[in-house]
Regions:
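Short, well-ordered loop/turn and helix-capping segments at boundaries between secondary-structure elements
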Residues: 59, 154-157
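Short aromatic-cysteine micro-motif
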Residues: 1-143, 201
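Residue-level signal for functionally critical sites in structured catalytic/ligand-binding pockets
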Residues: 1, 47, 150, 194-196
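Active-site-proximal beta-strands of protease catalytic cores
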Residues: 146-154
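Residue-level recognition of short, solvent-exposed, well-ordered loop/turn junctions
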Residues: 143-144, 192
Length: 201
């Protein structure tokens, strides 16, 4: 497994990267820990970090507008993050039109990717490269909602201890918004299971 998935890459935040999926929780943690460099520690993010990221997006979104509009903008962004993330993420029920020339999409579970342009006019499960549309990037944080579930280090429940966050392109954005938390076991992997890591010194 590890010879096929080297962990010597430098971590970057950029558009048009392929989602790293089909990874079990423990594999994701091993990969995340190996993506450190220059004294930086790396790991899967903790649940509290996920929640603080959502709060950061909320506060920065509100800060960016004039005082008269702040209450409405706060209501809207909280709804988008907590109740219905359809319009800010790649979900089954989000009908989008990808116009970024370097973005790619997959209609066969990530086996092959095709170069956009692509317009989704019916509900369908389409996997995208990162940041494929500007609406999926909130404060330069890509795909916090939809596309693939992301493993975190938080505990979920006794039967399904490993938490996944944020929903996926196979689900509905109103049922699995960015704040959503589900549980799985360490043995599970899948097309819509990926991970997000944190870096700190």
């Amino acid at each position: 497994y590890y010879t096929e998935h080297p962990i010597t890459q430098k971590v970057v935040i950029k558009e048009n990267a392929y989602p790293y999926n089909w990874v079990r929780r423990d594999q994701a943690q091993t990969l995340a820990e190996g993506m450190n460099y220059d004294g930086v520690t790396s790991s899967l993010i903790y649940g509290v970090q996920w929640d603080l990221t959502l709060k950061y997006i909320e506060e920065k979104t509100v800060e960016a507008v004039e005082e008269a509009n702040k209450d409405k903008v706060r209501t809207d962004i909280k709804r988008d993050l907590i109740s219905d993330s359809t319009k800010i993420g790649n979900y089954n029920n989000n009908l989008w039109n990808i116009t970024k020339a370097k973005a790619k999409y997959s209609t066969n579970h990530g086996n092959t990717f095709n170069v956009c342009l692509y317009s989704k006019t019916l509900s369908a499960s389409v996997l995208l490269t990162t940041g494929a549309d500007t609406s999926f990037s909130l404060m330069n944080i890509y795909d916090i909602a939809g596309n693939v579930w992301e493993w975190t280090r938080e505990f979920c429940s006794a039967k399904s201890p490993c938490a996944i966050r944020g929903g996926s392109c196979y689900l509905n954005g109103s049922y699995n918004p960015a704040r959503d938390r589900n549980g799985n076991t360490t043995r599970v992997s899948g097309i819509d299971l990926g991970f997000r890591l944190g870096l700190w010194k």
